UniProtKB/Swiss-Prot annotation:
Cellular component aspect of the GO annotation: plasma membrane; proton-transporting ATP synthase complex
Reaction(s) this enzyme catalyzes, per UniProt: ATP + H2O + 4 H(+)(in) = ADP + phosphate + 5 H(+)(out)
Chain's gene name: atpD
SUPFAM superfamilies: C-terminal domain of alpha and beta subunits of F1 ATP synthase, N-terminal domain of alpha and beta subunits of F1 ATP synthase, P-loop containing nucleoside triphosphate hydrolases
Location within or outside the cell: Cell inner membrane
Protein name: ATP synthase subunit beta
Key words of the record: ATP synthesis, ATP-binding, Cell inner membrane, Cell membrane, CF(1), Hydrogen ion transport, Ion transport, Membrane, Nucleotide-binding, Translocase, Transport
Alphabetical list of InterPro entries matching this protein: AAA+_ATPase (IPR003593), ATP-synt_VA_C (IPR055190), ATP_synth_F1_bsu (IPR005722), ATPase_a/bsu_AS (IPR020003), ATPase_alpha/beta_chains (IPR050053), ATPase_F1/V1/A1_a/bsu_N (IPR004100), ATPase_F1/V1/A1_a/bsu_N_sf (IPR036121), ATPase_F1/V1/A1_a/bsu_nucl-bd (IPR000194)
């Protein structure tokens, strides 16, 4: 083991000098004297000096402290022992339940599977959320992004997806909390415990209050655990909340590493950093990783470099809209903005495709008519347009749904709606079968039968 000493500390970035013949490799993990702090090598500056990022607080460190090179990247526990446990970026348990007791550790930096080993899946993953199953269906082994500004419901939607899929899917899940609120991590843990699925979930947290090094690497820690399950031939779910914070952590240390900022102050290596992470989240011929990633959209601007870079890696994008949330329609998913590569008649079948496109056509026409209605009122519309407006308003309300994880807020029990019922309900509205029902009957219900029952009660 070679050793060096700290020569400079600027925030989370630390320069360490080693003898010239024993300079550590990039991504090697270094241990500071006392063993409490781990550093990861980012750059070799020449003259035996390496620039590192601290995985933890740099308080109490000073120049001259001895640093040992471990001659290996950061490695974390993998395998079934991680299930039901909460770990930090280095794989240390933070749930006060004692050591993990792992049989194997793996480095967090690995290469993505080769082209020959990758496989794409065409099987649909039913989520039980009407709007998602209808207009932006998920693929098993696909990548999904939940895009939204502050407070439109990304985390609640993710919790509901975990609740529905983890229970129905009965496979293994890995949850990576990247720079999010500790309270949400806490809520998630107890939610899983209550749902009796805690023994199928491994949790890795690098929360908001942690240094940028932790937030930058915690996504890779979670991904490494998911890759191990995949390579054992399992189908894994990987949840990441929030990908934007991963980018932000990179931005925080980028300037300290001496890089010139690029557009909007982001790091110049933004696309590469995102690519390194996303290319590893993939399915192989052995097993699959289905990932759901929450993506914060700064100032509701989808053209911001961070969400824009994420878009290109995803199979399905679920866009949450503030306008829809303002109407009180939850989940506030925009059916016109959300897309999926699976929305193809060859994959989902002709009926599903026709209904989904029909719903989008009616909603788009209603959007166009809104200006006319605002100026001239409903009476000036043709009979055909009046009918479109009426059906669009019913569809809008029918896209809402009570969530299991939001029962405490709404007071109504959550509903899981099968894909068959979803298609039947929307097809009925489009065909005019329910033109006689009041639009309020469609608000916050599960299947169409429930809407019919609700209409009878309100009469």
């Amino acid at each position: 083991m070679s050793s060096g000493q700290i020569v400079q500390i600027i925030g989370a970035v630390i320069d360490v000098e080693f003898p010239r013949d024993t300079v550590p490799k990039v991504y090697d993990a270094l241990k500071v004297e006392g063993g409490a702090t781990t550093l990861e090598v980012q750059q070799q500056l020449g003259d035996g000096i390496v620039r590192t990022i601290a995985m933890g607080s740099t308080e109490g460190l000073r120049r001259g402290l001895q640093v040992e090179n471990t001659n290996a990247p950061i490695s974390v526990p993998v395998g079934t022992q991680t299930l039901g446990r909460i770990m930090d970026v280095l794989g240390n348990p933070i749930d006060e339940k004692g050591p993990i007791g792992e049989e194997e550790r793996m480095p967090i930096h690995r290469t993505a599977p080769g082209y020959a080993d990758q496989s794409s899946s065409r099987d649909l993953l039913e989520t039980g959320i009407k709007v998602i199953d209808l207009v932006c269906p998920f693929a098993k082994g696909g990548k999904v992004g939940l895009f939204g500004g502050a407070g439109v419901g990304k985390t609640v939607n993710m919790m509901e997806l975990i609740n529905n899929i983890a229970k129905e899917h009965s496979g293994l899940s890995v949850f990576a909390g990247v720079g999010e609120r500790t309270r949400e991590g806490n809520d998630f843990y107890y939610e899983m415990e209550e749902s009796k699925v805690l023994d199928k979930v491994a949790m890795v947290y690098g929360q908001m209050n942690e240094p940028p090094g932790n937030r930058l690497r915690v996504a890779l820690t979670g991904l490494t655990m998911a890759e191990k399950f995949r390579d054992e031939g399992r189908d894994v779910l990987l949840f990441v909340d929030n990908i934007y914070r991963y980018t932000l952590a990179g931005t925080e240390v980028s300037a300290l590493l001496g890089r010139m900022p690029s557009a909007v102050g982001y790091q110049p290596t933004l696309a590469e950093e995102m690519g390194v992470l996303q290319e590893r989240i993939t399915s192989t011929k052995v097993g699959s990783i289905t990932s759901v990633q929450a993506v914060y959209v700064p100032a509701d601007d989808l053209t911001d470099p961070s969400p824009a870079t994420t878009f290109s890696h995803l199979d399905a994008t679920v866009v949450l809209s503030r306008d829809i949330a303002a109407k009180g329609i939850y989940p506030a998913i925009d059916p016109l903005d959300s897309t999926s590569r699976q929305l193809d008649p060859l994959v989902i079948g002709q009926e599903h495709y026709d209904v989904a496109r029909g719903v989008q056509t009616v909603l788009q026409r209603y959007k166009e008519l809104k200006d006319i209605i605002a100026i001239l009122g409903m009476d000036e519309l043709s009979e055909e347009d009046k009918q479109i407006v009426s059906r669009a308003r019913k569809i809008e309300r029918f896209l809402s749904q009570p969530f299991h994880v939001a029962e405490v807020f709404t007071g109504s029990p959550g509903k899981y709606v099968s894909l068959k019922d979803t298609i039947r309900g929307f097809k009925g509205i489009l065909d005019g079968e329910f033109d006689h029902l009041p639009e309020q009957a469609f608000y916050m219900v599960g299947g169409i039968d429930e809407a019919v029952e609700k209409a009878k009660k309100t009469k």
